[in-house]
């Protein structure tokens, strides 16, 4: 049921998606050029091309909550994001540390979903990288870095799905160094 809600919200919100400029390459060509044998690279490249993702958390009221979020960076197979300590989403993720992200392309009828367990970090080098990766974060919280907290995902599962006959449907379990250490 929760997966259906996320997919429906993803499809509903696709009109509001922001895409970075790639005038020399169609979106279909971009997708065709992905290395589908490497799920991590698919996720990273899609999230970089479509910098605004929609993330779903389990709300404090027990209902799904969806909001725009921004992938920050990948390092050594680990996907990093951030939030702000006074946001409701931070409290939700503390109470229920799982998130699902979705980004969609209406033109090719293609989407990427990613889910995983949220692990917070106060490592200043990670938070600094989040600021480096995001002009929005810097403009909003550059003078208040103390309220920003980083997080990375473990137990990551990703799916690339398309209604286009020219693209595959694939899913991956993306283990990283923190999964292996557990």
Residue ranges and their predicted role:
Residues 1-4:
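Positively charged n-region of N-terminal signal peptides that target proteins for export
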Residues 24-54:
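Active-site-proximal "nucleotidyltransferase
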Residues 24-35, 113-182:
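Charged, gly/pro-rich active-site loop segments
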Residues 9-17:
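Hydrophobic core
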Residues 45-60, 99-103:
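A short, Trp-centered hydrophobic/proline-enriched beta-strand micro-motif
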Residues 17-25:
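Sec-dependent signal peptide cleavage junction
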Residues 72-109:
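A short mixed-secondary-structure module that forms the rim of ligand-binding clefts
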Residues 54, 79-80, 159:
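General beta-strand recognition
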């Amino acid at each position: 049921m929760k997966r259906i809600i996320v997919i429906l919200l993803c499809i509903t919100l696709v009109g509001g998606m922001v895409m970075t400029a790639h005038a020399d390459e169609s979106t279909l060509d971009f997708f065709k050029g992905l290395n589908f044998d490497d799920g991590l690279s698919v996720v990273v490249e899609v999230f970089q091309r479509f910098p605004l993702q929609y993330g779903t958390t389990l709300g404090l009221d027990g209902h799904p909550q969806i909001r725009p979020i921004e992938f920050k960076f990948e390092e050594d197979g680990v996907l990093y994001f951030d939030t702000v300590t006074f946001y409701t989403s931070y409290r939700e993720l503390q109470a229920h540390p799982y998130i699902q992200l979705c980004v969609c392309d209406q033109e090719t009828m293609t989407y990427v979903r990613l889910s995983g367990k949220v692990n917070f970090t106060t490592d200043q080098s990670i938070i600094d990288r989040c600021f480096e990766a995001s002009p929005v974060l810097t403009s909003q919280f550059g003078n208040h870095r103390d309220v920003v907290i980083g997080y990375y995902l473990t137990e990551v599962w990703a799916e690339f799905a398309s209604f286009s006959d020219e693209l595959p449907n694939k899913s991956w379990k993306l283990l990283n160094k923190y999964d292996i250490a557990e």
